[in-house]
From Swiss-Prot:
Signal peptide: none annotated. This is Putative nickel insertion protein. NCBIfam families: nickel pincer cofactor biosynthesis protein LarC (TIGR00299). It comes from the Archaea. HAMAP family: LarC (MF_01074). The lineage of its organism: Archaea, Methanobacteriati, Methanobacteriota, Methanomada group, Methanococci. GO terms for molecular function: lyase activity; nickel cation binding.
Length: 379
């Protein structure tokens, strides 16, 4: 897995430079050249005395003047590159065009890119599409907050605030920060690339496997580079804890809540407690996947009458889990096997499987658990 660290912003060429060591350089260059006639130079440079990669795009093409959405789209569409790379490139270009269309209030097909566009943007987009597909980055990448810089940037429309309007539009939903450097550190193309990748905000602990730096063009007091980590994610789950207190609810309703939330929650607890004025109550706690936390919170409020549910970000390190099947009285019983560092730490039978055997053969459930334990020891 890769983690993007745009502590000094992100641009198209910074992304290519940071990722170039992780892909086949010759295939990368040939893919871009199938779209646009350019020379591509890959070299090592130093930024703030730190060694970094630099990908330079040098024009020698007759179609370098393509700078409208329609023109660039046609250049990419008519190229003979791998279809999935072509689709990704067109999607990144579309993100750029739709942002420009919105901030300038023009039809997307008539968008003129002005500062972006021309040979370098085409190469950046196609190169990024190549990298994204070869490394499977889409929806499978992490990032840290993006440094957008500060101050103003000069355009043909005049001075515009940083981030530029199109960049700000693209960055919606991503975590950014302003620094004390009065420069445009994050460009529209860089924003469109990271927006398309749709990374998750990096949280928790990781093991670093490799580090790469992609140099930018600016010379700043800050290291002007995009840093990329290839990391091994310590096995965690993206989960949240929902919690609320209720003091006017019956045990029957709580039992029904179990049924309603079956299949939606990882775990559900009802904890007896006392509230103000010594009122007996329950604390309801549910562990859920982040993407359905709001849905589950609303179910809890609707079913219990609670006026609010607290949401806590939590981390949970988990063992590797797998199922294996054993035979008991010629019936199949699934065992959930837990491992840490390839060492088996637990083997637990599925309750429903044992319950069915207990009913079928008239054997106490507790005796079946004992037989399972003996069977595991023998195996």
């Amino acid at each position: 897995m890769f983690l993007l660290d745009p502590f000094s912003g992100i641009s198209g060429d910074m992304f290519l430079s940071a990722m170039i060591d992780f892909v086949d350089k010759e295939d990368f260059i040939n893919t871009i050249k199938k779209v646009i006639d350019v020379e591509i130079e890959i070299k090592k440079v130093k930024k703030c005395h730190i060694l970094a990669n630099k990908v330079n795009i040098i024009p020698k093409c007759i179609n370098c003047n393509a700078n409208t959405y329609k023109d660039i789209k046609n250049v990419i569409k008519s190229s003979d590159i791998q279809e999935d790379i072509k689709i990704t490139a067109l999607e990144i270009l579309k993100i750029l065009a739709e942002a420009e269309s919105k901030v300038h209030n023009v039809d997307v097909e008539n968008v003129h890119f002005h500062e972006v566009g021309n040979y370098d943007t085409i190469a950046d987009i196609v190169g990024a599409a190549y990298i994204i597909n070869k490394l499977n980055l889409k929806n499978n990448c992490l990032y840290k907050p993006i440094n957008v810089g500060n101050g103003f940037v000069r355009t043909e429309h005049g001075l515009l605030p940083v981030p530029a309007p199109a960049t700000a539009e693209i960055l919606k939903g991503l975590k950014i920060f302003f620094s004390d450097i009065n420069e445009e550190l994050t460009t529209p193309t860089g924003s469109a690339i990271i927006k398309y990748i749709n990374p998750k905000l990096a949280k928790g602990a990781f093991i670093i496997k490799e580090v790469s730096y992609g140099a930018g063009d600016k010379d700043l007091n800050l290291l002007n580079a995009l840093r990329v980590f290839r990391v091994e994610d310590i096995k965690r789950e993206d989960i949240v804890l929902l919690e609320t207190n209720v003091d006017d609810i019956s045990a029957e309703i709580l039992g029904y809540l179990y049924e309603v939330l079956d299949g939606k929650v990882r775990d559900l607890h009802f904890i007896p407690t006392y509230m103000k004025k010594n009122r007996p109550a329950y604390t309801i706690r549910a562990i859920v996947d982040r993407d359905i936390a709001e849905e589950v919170a609303k179910i809890i409020m609707r079913e219990t009458g609670s006026l609010g549910v607290r949401i806590f970000d939590i981390e949970r390190i988990t063992a590797d889990r797998e199922f294996k099947t054993i035979k008991l009285f010629d019936e199949s019983v699934r065992l959930k096997v837990g491992r840490v560092n390839d060492e088996i730490i637990s083997q637990k039978p599925e309750f429903e499987d044992l319950k069915n055997i207990a009913k079928k053969y008239g054997i106490p459930l507790k005796d079946l658990y004992k037989l399972i334990n003996i069977s595991q020891i023998k195996n």
